[in-house]
Swiss-Prot record:
Organism this protein belongs to: Sphingopyxis alaskensis (strain DSM 13593 / LMG 18877 / RB2256) (Sphingomonas alaskensis)
Record-given protein name: UDP-N-acetylglucosamine--N-acetylmuramyl-(pentapeptide) pyrophosphoryl-undecaprenol N-acetylglucosamine transferase
Role this protein plays: Cell wall formation. Catalyzes the transfer of a GlcNAc subunit on undecaprenyl-pyrophosphoryl-MurNAc-pentapeptide (lipid intermediate I) to form undecaprenyl-pyrophosphoryl-MurNAc-(pentapeptide)GlcNAc (lipid intermediate II).
Membrane topology recorded in Swiss-Prot or TrEMBL: Peripheral membrane protein
Pathway participation: Cell wall biogenesis; peptidoglycan biosynthesis
Assigned keywords, A-Z: Cell cycle, Cell division, Cell inner membrane, Cell membrane, Cell shape, Cell wall biogenesis/degradation, Glycosyltransferase, Membrane, Peptidoglycan synthesis, Transferase
Compartment(s) where it occurs, according to its Swiss-Prot or TrEMBL record: Cell inner membrane
Catalytic activity: di-trans,octa-cis-undecaprenyl diphospho-N-acetyl-alpha-D-muramoyl-L-alanyl-D-glutamyl-meso-2,6-diaminopimeloyl-D-alanyl-D-alanine + UDP-N-acetyl-alpha-D-glucosamine = di-trans,octa-cis-undecaprenyl diphospho-[N-acetyl-alpha-D-glucosaminyl-(1->4)]-N-acetyl-alpha-D-muramoyl-L-alanyl-D-glutamyl-meso-2,6-diaminopimeloyl-D-alanyl-D-alanine + UDP + H(+)
Length: 392
């Protein structure tokens, strides 16, 4: 039986940071460990946290906005670091794991001050600011892609490709396989645009569908996430076209909708890309053009090169090109199925387990474990001394 250890996770206040942290927490708790998570107020409002997860809010100012903003941010980070040291002294984690974002920084700095092993996980194909700062200082860097931009030179040996943790419901879709499509059968299209939808998708996708032949419109079913402001106009356009469509500002049952879909049109956030690849769903990606360091464009490189997706810069995302791609996939089942296989080849369904294995590997064994594995008293005493040295 695995001995219980304590792990402290720290993540920024967005779903992109929090959901992988929740997934790792779930896995570590299932392995019998005790897990705590540090974030900000915004992060801890994101649903999906395991019931057994302990949560803490620490100050973590953002160092930006001119000299005064930098000073306020630095003072908040310093205060957060001091409070994180107190938390670490009390919780006694074997390892501290950061998931990026400014709220992860105080805990990682405190872990360094208290000589705790540190692991960071980067969800995107471009290392974020906090992870870029911490990569030279931590023990391991878990990444989701083979090619990582802005990774500090000289620290490549710390890099471990684990992938982005995905939900068990998504892994189950992969195991079920791709839904068959007959040449004259229903073609199911899922359109998602980040947490609250994207206006560009609400404008371009219905216009593209309007260009399809009548025979294909009769076979088409659409589920589309829309911004509240766009909702009625998109519904009206599909009704005018006679297309069976369901539109909503938020897709609550996303795994079930993904299982249903033959193809997806989406933004290119790290979680979305990971889930589509794991499920094996062909996609048209429209990376958000204002993402930090253009990381969404880099997130889809592997999938596009494998043939499981195509990607448009937002300025090139025009109805005629989108219609052409939808039509080809809908009328050529062989092409669609091959794209699905190529997408699945980029999926990493064991990402959560692999990340948990990596994190556990840096946890010093508890004293009783060392005693149990010792063949003799001298060996046990030697093991205890080594474990204490590692834990310092």
């Amino acid at each position: 039986m695995t001995a219980t250890r304590h792990f402290l996770l720290a993540a920024g206040g967005t779903g992109g940071h929090m959901l992988p942290a929740y997934a790792l927490a779930d896995e570590l708790i299932a392995r019998g460990h005790r897990v705590a998570l540090v974030s900000d107020d915004r992060g801890l409002k994101i649903p999906g946290a395991p019931a057994e997860l302990e949560t803490h809010v620490l100050p973590a100012g953002r160092a930006s906005g001119g000299p005064l903003g930098w000073l306020k941010g630095a003072l908040a980070i310093r205060k957060g670091r001091r409070m994180a040291i107190e938390l670490i002294d009390d919780f006694d984690p074997a390892v501290v794991v950061g998931f990026g974002g400014y709220p992860s920084l105080p805990s990682l700095l405190a872990a360094g001050a208290t000589k705790r092993p540190r692991v960071i996980h980067e969800q995107n194909a471009v290392l974020g600011r906090v992870n870029r700062l911490m990569a030279p200082r931590v023990d391991a860097v878990a990444v989701a892609y083979h090619h990582i931009q802005r990774y500090p030179a000289g620290h490549e040996l710390k890099m471990h490709i684990t992938g982005n943790p995905v939900r068990d419901e998504i892994v189950a879709i992969r195991e079920e396989g791709f839904p068959p499509l007959l040449e004259d059968g229903i073609f199911r299209l899922l359109v998602v645009g980040g947490s609250l939808g994207a206006t560009v998708l609400s404008e371009v996708v219905p216009a593209a569908i309007a260009m399809l032949p009548r025979a294909l419109l009769d076979r088409l079913q659409v589920v589309q996430q829309c911004r509240e402001d766009d909702l009625e106009a998109v519904r009206a356009r599909y009704a005018e076209l006679g297309v069976a469509a369901e539109c909503a500002p938020y897709i609550k049952d996303f795994p079930e909708r993904l299982r249903w879909a033959h193809m997806v049109i989406a933004r290119a956030g790290a979680s979305t890309v990971a889930e589509l690849a794991c499920a094996g769903r062909p996609a048209i990606f429209v990376p958000y053009p204002h993402a930090m360091d253009d990381h969404q464009t880099y997130n889809v490189v592997d999938l596009v090169e494998a043939g499981g997706a195509i990607s448009f810069r937002q300025s090139d995302f025009i109805p005629a090109e989108v219609a052409k791609h939808i039509q080809r996939m809908a009328v050529e089942p062989g092409v669609l199925e091959e794209a699905a296989e190529r997408a699945a080849s980029c999926g990493l369904p064991d990402a959560t387990r692999d990340l948990a294995d990596l994190v556990e590997s840096f946890a010093a064994p508890p004293m009783m474990d060392v005693i149990r594995v010792g063949a003799s008293l001298p060996r046990a005493a030697s093991g205890i001394a080594a474990a204490r040295r590692e834990a310092k």
